[in-house]
Amino acid sequence: MRQMGNLRSSVYEVVLERLNRIFSDFDNVYVSFSGGKDSGVLLNLCIDYIRQNKLNRRLGVFHIDYEVQYEETTRYVDRVLASNSDILDVYRICVPFKVTTCASMYQNYWRPWEDSMRPLWVREKPENCYTKEDFDFYTDDLWDYEFQIKFAEWLHKRNAACLLYTSDAADDK
């Protein structure tokens, strides 16, 4: 429990306070959802908050689909997005940007969803995904982390003020 003045609050209570502030101060909130545990908890906290407080609003979800990922992760992502489609605006990204790899001695990057490699794709693109044609900023030189920044700028132009809420396990101390 953390000390707040003379009050003691649980982590959950502090999260609810933060969500109250976020959903009060920002018209457009979106969550970065990888399908992992941390981002899954964050997304579900936001979904639960919207439902429990009967907010008349939608929540954006930014999901980079890297094509090659655990099958169970893909099923989990599909399940969460489908079961909450009534309140989610999903940005499922299937773009052939550069992604760092250590699986090759000859290449330092690979490209998910690269059209020229379609016969080797692990699976087909999901329905209603966003592709490189949807983004005027896309170039073949773009790395995945650069895409994330440019996506935020792109979304800001479309929706005015936005807040991206992320869960970064690498930041956990």
Name every feature range the model reports, one short phrase each.
Residues 1-29:
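Active-site-adjacent "lid"/gating segments
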Residues 2-7, 55-162:
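ATP-dependent adenylate-handling ligase core
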Residues 7-15, 35-42, 69-73:
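Phosphate/oxyanion-binding active-site loops and adjacent basic polyanion-contact surfaces
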Residues 17, 36, 149-153:
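A generic local structural motif
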Residues 22-55:
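A phosphate-binding catalytic loop at a beta-strand-loop-alpha-helix junction
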Residues 165-173:
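Single conserved hydrophobic/aromatic residue that forms the stacking wall/gate
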